[in-house]
Amino acid sequence: MLQIEGRSAGDCRVRFEGKRYTPFPASRGVWEIFLPLGIKTAGERELILERISSDGPAEEYSFYVEVAPREIRTIHLGKASQAMRSSQPSIPEQQKKVLKAIRNVEPKRYWTRPFSSPVQGEISTEFGLRRDLGTYSYYHWGVDFSAAEGTPVWTANSGKVILSESGFNVYGNLLIIDHGQGVVSCYFHLSKILKETGDMVDRNEVIGEVGNTGWSTGPHLHFAVYLQGRAVDPFWLVSFTSK
């Protein structure tokens, strides 16, 4: 989280990791934004603060932050997982809908309380795990909770449902909630969806039930959090907002 204070804070932009971000008003004279980190980002990184001026070039101020490396585990998926992906290939139009939703940036902030875990269940797969299928590999951009089918799933925080869809090949039945200011949460592989696109939801409101839909080999909830369109560890956000 980056906070900028001062009368001209609203005229500032931030450049970090090759992207430009616009902070949001938090209170009088205070602007802030969550800056996401890539999973492999480590070491000293430059952060550039731009102060936009109407009568001249922007002023730039450089800061450096030290990023601790993240340990990344790798698991090798078996033939069952490979066969499932072959029989249920990802569909471009479905993927585009999900990508558009997770990249949504709504200036309004919907939440005021800490984020929380969305289901009662054991963690079966952690964030950032590298999955190797032999011919290719990919990272697990969320946390999987193992739970019985039909277990209630609730919102991690208040927000607006921006995507409610069923029958997606990869994600199954899904809900995506916009919490405002670039914070988006995802709930995949549901058996039942209880909210529609456009619905406003409160923190800890039941929105669906755990299922086994899409690319899934057993009942579980895939819970993901995106900041400014980039996946981050959901438990980091839960911990940070609880301080």
Segments from the language model and where they lie:
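Terminal peptide-recognition signature
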Residues: 18, 47, 123, 145, ...
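Conserved, short, structured surface segments that act as functional micro-motifs
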Residues: 175-178, 183, 199-243
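Surface-exposed, glycine-biased beta-strand/turn segments
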Residues: 64-171
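Cationic-aromatic interfacial patches
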Residues: 1-70
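Small beta-strand-rich domains/subdomains or short beta-sheet motifs embedded
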Residues: 146, 152-156, 187-188, 198-201, ...
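Zn2+-dependent peptidoglycan hydrolase active-site motif and core
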Residues: 156-194, 219
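Envelope-exposed proteins and targeting segments
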Residues: 10, 43-45, 61, 119, ...
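Short, well-structured beta-strand-loop connectors
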Residues: 152-163, 194-210
